[in-house]
Amino acid sequence: MRKRGILALCLGAMGALGAVVCVPPPPAGNTASFETEPLRPGIADPATALTFASTLIDDSPHLLLVVGYADAVARGIDLGAGADPFDTLQRLGRDALIGMARTEADRSADFPLARLLPAGQAARQVATGTNFREHAQEVAVERPFNFPKFGPPTPAVTTVLRGDGVLLDYEGEICARFDRPLAATEDFAAAVKGFFLCGDFTDRALLTRLVTEDVESGIGFSDAKSGPDFFPTGPFLVIPADWRAFVADERITTSVDGDPRQDARGAGMTLDFAALAEVMLKTGASPDWQYQGQQVPLIAAGVLPQGAALMSGTPAGVIYRPPDTREIVCGSVWHICTAGFLREGFRPAVIERFLGRLAAADVFLRPGQQVRHASSQLGEIIVEVR
């Protein structure tokens, strides 16, 4: 009798919850704010910022001074094989390169976006979470945080593989790299700063399984956001005369099959790159992060190597939303009333039920879709999902 009473109580509870709160909610709406004017990628005036790219010519990487960009084609002046943007700027000087861009454009040639090499260089970056207020609100995290991201940069025209069981999500970001290693805040202040467009793909299923209640610890993020094709980078490295003004005004967008998903400017960052560097250098040497089951530091030996990127974080408009109170309550009742506690723990059961509902909603990236990150002066990235 007692067992039948418990069963009846559970069935009644599930029925009531199902009628009131446990029906699958509609897909979460996009919380991003969108500018009315369409974004047309171009390049900065040379006096504002110098734009560089690289391409293979006779199987050797050549540096280009970019003098124009339209319709996924860059026009650039070949500065020679093996040249580095930062070294070239130091050797020739900003004024000479501005003059070259303005008076020697007849030396330029066309280079399709697909021929340009990645602006990123290193296989380990410092990534940033919830550094745009609207994005922090949509994923219910209060403050920005960092984590190491592993995996080589891929070019501006590329692919990303959605593996079995993966809930693949996009993020568009601004990345920075520097002309020297950063070991102290003085290094950041003295460094020449270059910026490029970048993407940050995420396996939301893996992240949901690994993340802890202390989201700002970054645990789970390195595993869910690292991989051979999870870091696409734009075609240009842009070195502005005034980096703060340039970043603040830079607009970045994301679309999926032409549907707008993200739209923001760098001014929306909670922490600018100087503040991000300060936090990174203050805490980065401690092995407080996790990747593939091992404790790792944010930056090895407390130094961001030359070539490694510091990432801005993404604005609002991602697909994922964390489980809310309704989801947790419904999952808890289901776990108890189906005797799930005899098979697995409470948290895994609730998570797997939540992930199953997300997969059934079919809102995450699917093979055949195209993700496009675009920017006002950093170029664009076109990714085919496979």
Which ranges hold each PLM region?
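Short, Lys/Arg- and Gly-enriched loop/turn segments at beta-strand edges
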Residues: 184, 318-325, 358-361, 378-386
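Glycine-enriched loop-and-adjacent helix/strand subsegments that border the catalytic/binding cleft
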Residues: 32-38, 123-293, 334-352, 360-362
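Short helix/loop segment immediately N-terminal to the Walker
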Residues: 288-301, 326
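N-terminal non-catalytic cap/leader segment that marks the start of a structured domain
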Residues: 12-145, 150-151, 157-158, 165, ...
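N-terminal Sec-pathway targeting helices
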Residues: 1-12
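Loop/turn positions that initiate beta-strands
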Residues: 306-308, 368
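Short, well-ordered loop/turn sites that connect or cap secondary structure elements
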Residues: 302-304, 365
